[in-house]
Amino acid sequence: DEKQLRIYYMPKALYIDPNETLRPKDHELKLPVIPVMKYNKTVKEELKEGNFTKEDLLRIYRDMSYIREFETMLNQVKTTGGYNGVAYNNPGPAHLSAGQEAAAVGMAYCLDTDDFIFGSHRSHGEILAKGLRSIQILPEDELKKVMEEFWGGATLNVAKKAYDGDDTKELGIRFLLYGAMAEIFARTTGFNKGLGGSMHTFFTPFGIYPNNAIVGGSGSIAVGAALYKKVNRKKGIVVANLGDGAMARGPVLEGMTFASMDQFNTLWE
């Protein structure tokens, strides 16, 4: 493929013709109506319309349950010093997102391993959701290779100790849950050897890129990752998971501005 290098120079003087710039037709911006809170279907309706299979919906519910229990575990460890009778002290941060499981799992359901996610300081749920989705769609031989080659199998070996079955997908789930938990608890068997912690965990084989302690920080980083994909003609999209408060932060507005400057032709559909 031909690659072109374009060099732009800042002009010393730029004449602006009022007759061209201030044309009446340019004085009006028209935006389409954006529907809000329009979804209102039951599980039975979704099944009847063929949008999901029963297995799809059960898996979605299972993933939501995993995330809720994971966050419940972290909260109990933080507030009571233990979980299910096992004493443990976690002096590190634990920014939870209990109640937002559907948003994380719904996002991940639409993605594959070529898609990237970036998050916030409350991204445990998104990490688990994307990981569970990747485990579901990856061929077993590829999943096994990912687990065996990651840190020389250090994380996998711990997960194996608590599982004597031969289901690769089930082992993958245990690998994911343990790797994320060990990272939050600053263990060397965590996904980032305990150096990322709760707010900077990532696992790139599943398309999970670092979440960010800076509120809204992923808003501009994700745009850069998307531009990388476009320039290099890589598959997939990039998702920045942010809270409503982060939408007013500088990095998010910068990301939107950058994305609208003709680097991308479509922001959303």
Question: Could you tell me what each predicted segment is?
Answer:
Residues D1-A103, L143-K145, T155-L156, Y163-D164:
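Conserved acidic/glycine
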Residues Q76, G85-L267:
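Cofactor-binding active-site loop characterized by glycine-rich and histidine/acidic residues
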